[in-house]
A protein has these predicted regions:
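Extracellular, repeat-based ectodomains that mediate carbohydrate processing or recognition
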Residues: 20-486
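Bacterial Sec-dependent N-terminal signal peptides
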Residues: 1-21
Length: 486
């Protein structure tokens, strides 16, 4: 008969083995983005949104970080296994700016889903260690954190066993959604994230509230308590940014909408309004754009953080990206429409920007797109603004993505004009171009393509500051691949 100690040892060993088996550290032989869809529509557009979504969603950031010390851009993405029904692989690779080569990607883990909401994000600490944060879509799957064994090295990652404080007790930090992670040499990690709360809504006790929050950690292992930013009705989707101000302080900004508490359906389908909050002391205090102190969490629709009321015009607000000028003033991009379903009936789909000039917000239309998820990313270089987005609505209209185009902003005219096409004559739609942290001129955007109306292979790409596009090889041999312009 087995003793209690033997049984206990076997149980503990099996748990440890299961944890260790999560970490794969396997080399892949190419770059394959996950293909994903949500919401069948039973019409020609087939899905609410779909395609190659290896760098989705807008609320995950960053997917890539440039290191001047290593002279490499490290990037992660939602990869696809080679199974008939591909599983989501969390993969990491780098582009070497000296040799102009990309490494073979390392498969850190298999997320055991095809849900692109579980896509990873990446960070590099002040010692050069690479961190991969494996997010989750809600509470049905766990989240993970991995750290490279060596600085600036992707050969081997080890599983971190993080904890956080909850009600004064130390708990496993094993679930986080919609993570945007930033690292500060002095204070460590700052994460904007979402957690799901049930039983708190007026309409539908089983429906979750997507609660916007933040969390911090000095070392990536021991994390603070979750501190809620917004608890308005059914919750929020937030995007964020960070900038080093001229006074040396790190400013962290959250831009978010709110989801109405609806009697039928999901409030996220009626996301509206745009709110702004900032902190310059790593989350100790928060202010609105007027530098007025705001107490958290926000609980009312009309609150001190509101900068744009889209609900009064019955318009939705899909927030994209945020970037800063040399003074630390922000610009964010968003798409407004009249409904969640794809197709012309909910148009016009207007891609817009909001810029804070130090006193007021200026809202400007960039152009019309054809889908709520036509994400665009913003750049500020040499005192000028530009925006990269799938604004050419081909080859598949009224679906996620399209052909990428670069737009330039004129301060004098206060308007956007088309600068140049980035992708052309594509067979699949390109979507979710993402800006790296500390981006280098050779690697300024990273994205995937995919057929939006049926399952397909999905390729990954990056582009430079000249608008030249470099496909990442779907399959290759050797440890490195010399990139070639498309």
């Amino acid at each position: 008969m087995r003793t209690f100690k033997t049984v206990l040892f076997s149980f503990v060993f099996s748990c440890l083995s299961a944890q260790e088996n999560i970490t794969l550290n396997i080399k892949d032989d190419g770059f394959r983005s996950i293909w994903y869809y949500i919401g069948k529509t039973n019409d020609e557009y087939t899905h609410k949104y779909s395609g190659g979504l290896g760098t989705y969603p807008a609320n995950h950031y960053p997917f890539s970080v440039y290191s001047a010390e290593a002279n490499k851009t490290f990037f992660c993405y939602g990869g696809a296994s080679k199974d008939p029904k591909p599983s989501l692989l969390h993969e990491v690779a780098y582009f070497d700016h000296k040799t102009k080569t990309v490494s073979r990607p390392t498969i850190v883990m298999d997320k055991k889903t095809d849900d692109a909401h579980d896509n990873p994000v990446i960070s590099i600490d002040n010692e050069g260690y690479i961190w991969i944060f494996s997010t989750s879509h809600g509470v049905n799957r766990p989240s993970y954190i991995h750290k490279s064994v060596k600085p600036f090295d992707i050969e081997k990652f080890e599983l971190v066993k993080p904890t956080y404080l909850k009600d004064g007790q130390i708990k496993p930090f094993d679930n986080f959604s919609y993570l945007q992670i930033y690292h500060d040499d002095e204070n460590g990690f700052f994460g904007f994230m979402t957690h799901y709360d049930t039983g708190v809504l007026k309409n539908g006790k089983s429906k979750p509230r997507r609660t916007s929050s933040f969390i911090t950690s000095k070392d990536g292992v021991s994390w603070s308590e979750l501190q809620d930013i917004g608890q308005v009705q059914e919750g929020h989707y937030q995007s964020s940014g960070a900038v080093r101000m001229q006074n040396g302080k790190l400013k962290l900004v959250s831009i978010f909408n709110y989801h109405p508490d609806t009697e039928k359906g999901a409030g996220l389908d009626y996301r509206a309004n745009i709110y702004y909050l900032q902190t310059t002391d790593f989350g100790k205090t928060w202010q609105n754009y007027k530098d007025e102190l705001v107490l958290l969490p926000l609980k009312e629709v009309n609150n001190a953080a509101l900068v744009l009321d889209t609900q009064k015009d019955k318009k939705l607000a899909y927030i994209n990206d945020i970037e800063f000028d040399a003074k630390g003033n922000e610009m964010f991009s968003f798409i407004s429409s009249f409904g969640p379903e794809p197709g012309p009936k909910n148009g016009p789909y207007e891609l817009k920007t909001g810029y804070f000039n130090g006193k007021d917000w200026n809202f400007t239309k960039v152009t019309e797109v054809d889908h709520n998820y036509d994400f665009g990313t913003i750049y500020h270089q040499k005192n000028s603004w530009s925006l990269l987005a799938p604004t050419n609505n081909t080859p598949y209209q009224y679906n996620t993505g399209g052909e990428l185009e670069l737009w330039k902003y004129s301060d004098k005219k206060q308007e956007w004009t088309l600068s140049q096409p980035i992708t052309k004559n594509s067979k699949k739609n390109h979507s979710y171009p993402r800006r790296p942290i500390h981006y280098h001129s050779d690697f300024q955007a990273f994205w995937a393509d995919g057929h939006p109306r049926q399952f397909s292979d999905a390729n990954l790409y990056f582009s430079n500051n000249k608008g030249e596009v470099f496909p990442l090889p779907y399959q290759f041999t050797g440890e490195h691949f010399k990139i070639q312009k498309k």
